[in-house]
Amino acid sequence: MEVKWTEEQREAITTRGKNVLVAAAAGSGKTAVLVERIINIVTDPEKPVDIDRLLVVTFTNAAASEMRERIAERLISLLDQHPEDKRLADQLTLLNKATITTIHSFCLDVVRKHFFLLDLDPSFRVGDDTETLLLKLEAMEELFEELYEKNDEGFLLLVESYGGTKGDQYLQDVLLKLYGFIRSLPWPEKWLNNVLEAFEVKEDFSFEDSKWAEVILDSIKVEILGLLNGMSVAIEKLREERGLEGYLSLFQSEAHHLKELIDSKSWNEFKKKIEAISFERLPKASKEADAEVKEEVRKLREDVKKRIREIRDKFFIDEEEEIKREIKKLYPVMKALADLILMFDKKYGEKKKEKGVIDFEDIEHFALKILSNEEVVSYYREKFEEIFIDEYQDSSLIQEAILSLIARDNPPNRFMVGDVKQSIYRFRQANPYIFFEKYTSYSQEGENKKILLYKNFRSRKEIIDAVNYIFEKIMSKNIGEVDYSEEEKLNYGANYESNPFEKENERTVEVHLIEREREEEFEEDEEILDDMQVEAHVVGERIKGLFREGFKVYDKEIGGYRPVEYRDICVLLRATEKWAYAFEEEFVKMGIPVFADTNAGYFDTAEIKTMLSLLQVIDNPMQDIPLLAVLRSPIFSFTEEELVDIRLEDADGTIYEALKKASLREDELGEKVRNFLDSLKRWQEKSIYMPVDEFLWYLYEETGFYSYVGAMPQGVERQANLRVLFERAKEYEETSFKGLFNFVNFINRLRTTSTDMGSAKTVGENENVVRVMSIHKSKGLEFPIVIVAGLGKQFNTKDLNEKILYHHFLGIGPEFVDYRRRLSYPSIVKEAIKYKIKLESLSEEMRVLYVALTRAKEKLILVASVKDIKERAKKWGKAKLLGKKISEYDVLKSRSYIDWIGSALIRHRDLKLLREFAEISPELEQDSSKWEVKIWNKRDVIIERKKDEGIEVLERLNALNLEGLHTEFRKEVEERLNYVYPYDRSSKLPAKLSVTEIKRILNDEVIDEETTSIFERRVLKTPLFLEKKRGLTPAERGIAMHLVMQKLDLSKDLSYRGIKEQIKDMVKNEILTEEQAKEVDANKIERFFKTPLGKRLLKAKEVRREVPFHIKISSREIYRDLPEVYQEEFIAVQGIIDCFFEEEGELVLIDYKTDYVENGKIEEIRDKYRVQIDLYGKALEEITGKKVKEKYIYLFFNDTIIKY
């Protein structure tokens, strides 16, 4: 059947004699177009080209194999139609030697053919990752040792500045990462020299004209535009309010100043304008003004003032000469870093030469060097009539340099296919700017032609509409690196037959939001695991729902619809580490067949942890943690009590020394210890002469551990994991490195550098299973049903906090370190690079989301865990819409995919529920996309999950045949199974609670099902040399105020000046930090002591402050719905009383609060803290035996006294 090509596809197939850039959107049939163009060229009736004179470069080996197969299929098909055509037969024969390959394979071929142009042994081999990493580590260790011996001044400066607290590990990691980065560049040494030259700051250098200033200024302008948008919203509100006319004119004037900042053309112009900005005092509002609106706009203005002040203080305090001096001061340490990189490159090169190996990066660099030879490059230019580059958006700078060298200029002969919106490999040094530069410079005419393929033949209209709706809102040239305009939008091109049995809205895109419990922190590993499991359960339930609903998918092979199968479903995750394992485990429990395609989690499996600990102990038994892991493992099965007894044998030494002493005991434990030590000695002796792989398998058999894990749940997979470790040991033995010590070091290095090996798989991905994979691995694939989960996970910005940042265009940005004063702060160069990397990282995240959403053919489901949905919805509702797009400022502020999606969707007509949460009524957008949102409560999911587990157990029990059992015995079994423990609630009651937790429980009138934390949070003092100018959080300000109120000498002068002097003394004595002292308002404290309550406190004979207490109260006083039987169940309560004083034999209690309090909310505050104050009063009477006659809260925010 003849393919019906679109006009744009046909143009891409037939255009000749030009450089052609095909911007091919997801699902647009780019591979089919590429294949057809190749067939068209080799069968051209006028100017045919043999297929072995074409260079076809693909991104992966799999893509190259697929391309070769598809070309072969087309040639065979044509040959069937024209069996007499000798040329077609010849092309089929030539296909075997056609250059259809990855860029690395092509470069390796160039190197093998022209090795004589390099100082390279012709018998060289490409080392695998294991061997080359070991060579790098060996070279680095030797280099560092040599430089220490020489007392190399530059190197020692580097060590002092960036060595870190754990030896040289941090500096070594920086070296490896930076070395890897610069080797992705065409001319790394030249790049390093240019970077170094920038830090020399020559006479003609102008920071204002530098690329660093340009980046910082652009980033600041985006932020100020966001502030201006906020001011605009406030101005609109003020226009509608009476009594705030003075506010309106002032806000308009200040908004004008912000606009002037944005319009600044240069750094110095911006500096002058921001220095000139001053915020006048707000005029008095009339009584008829709405208090809520007044407070809202006042707070917004305060935020603007604060941020403008921060920008000014951070970037525009220093004059040009001071900035130049700072950059120049960085030159010595940058020179030392550049020298270290070059020395390492030389040392590593020598190591490789000794072993006769080259590494992966060498392949491209050697090819580039060879192709710089005019004779060689002319050969390749002559050989290849046309160069095809697939996935062009993922090209690196060095790959672009290589392909540019062999391309022709007359006539141009490059055919490049890609989609910048799918460029997601920046971490592999892919540079989307290469594609984007051509995308903006190529046109429909001329020698450089651009062709757009935006008709999507993969997805249903519901998915196309949904993707367009989201990305037209959030993707822009600045964030995403392409403007999602009408030109970029996906156009529906698929031809799905109608399904007469389809239910209404069955294909609607679903958004499932799981509300996390309050006060949960997403960054804590245990709680992340909870979120992962809950999300996995929700996804599992939805998968089961698809089967229950009889969901059908279109099958091209049968030409109609069929019921959904597990293989039709794919769950996509941004990061599979931990997440994929949680999903796999949950699906197995739910009876859903699953294949998790992940390279992470291997080192976290119990069997691998145990075996690696054993290897570490055999290598060096003086390591307590691995040794304890081995002793507690099933191999030796020491109990906790036995380990305590062993430790008591030598409380101060290592565990190994304690074991040796315990071996002298004449009891059962002594015998057990002696058996362990004998085994250890035997294994140490064998490890000396046995190859690591053979020794490892010997351990598996000797310990019985391999058989043991096979009997555990998922035993087949666990044994497969042990075999993977054995295979890795075998590979290691094939390198030039030997011995257990080196192997253990190598594995440890893999773990610390996050280079996981991927757990073994016992289920194939082609079976009828749900696939769980990373979004990156899904690129180029398609699935009938796609579920994108983990969308609430925060973007990973960890790399931005590194001491040294680097960028191909902006160079290297170090932290400024004064190691003598133990002072460090980001240099202005680092700030510029940090801004740029953040922008590029967010752009990449946006493209990753685009790839995920465009994998779906028939059904798209999005899942996210969200903390406090109402608050998050309010945040989404505040995102400013400029035309059809959300402001770049709001897009930049977003911390997760769901923030982007939520901000885009909240104005959609289908998302009424979110608008109700946000308490907004915006003008609705009438878009053709269809959405459905469902809210899940995490607690309900956990309860449901436990019910499912219980039902599963009951079903298994019911399946047992009990008929043959003796009647009495059967009756006893049933009674035991049906027994309900009468004091079940006791098991859920905490042993201890803080007053804050009790206040929350009583205010909510809810019993937590899970144990509550018994520890109050404490803020630890930051070392002075690590303090940063970030400002204190409200909680930290409150702690600082309480600290001052506790430490003030009440007998001294308590005027404003006297209090300030005492605060200064507290800083000197290191009770307070400088930052805390600045945040404590002495005026507020002075005003307290002038109140009647404050005066009474000062007159009192006895005043006690910050008094901790522990009391015991009945559980029924806290959990009011408990039955009477719990009256004697007690809970320990702990807390700290701010202050009390004695007056006429009775006590007066005061609790200070630094909370922000809205006008008219005093009664709410009174109710909020009633439980807490009552408990403090009860505790005080118990511990003193005296009556508490009065209880007060003092609000520092508005100098208010609340009496109870």
Curated annotation (Swiss-Prot):
Residues 492-780 form the UvrD-like helicase C-terminal domain. Residues 3-460 form the UvrD-like helicase ATP-binding domain. GO terms for biological process: double-strand break repair via homologous recombination. GO terms for cellular component: cytosol; DNA helicase complex. It comes from the Bacteria. The keyword Thylakoid does not apply. SUPFAM superfamilies: P-loop containing nucleoside triphosphate hydrolases, Restriction endonuclease-like. ATP binds at residues 24-31. Keywords: ATP-binding, DNA damage, DNA repair, DNA-binding, Exonuclease, Helicase, Hydrolase, Isomerase, Nuclease, Nucleotide-binding. Transmembrane segments: none annotated. Disulfide bonds: none annotated. InterPro entries: AddA, DNA_helicase_UvrD-like_C, DNA_helicase_UvrD/REP, P-loop_NTPase, PDDEXK-like_dom_sf, PDDEXK_AddAB-type, Restrct_endonuc-II-like, UvrD-like_ATP-bd. Belongs to the helicase family. AddA subfamily. HAMAP family: AddA. This is ATP-dependent helicase/nuclease subunit A.
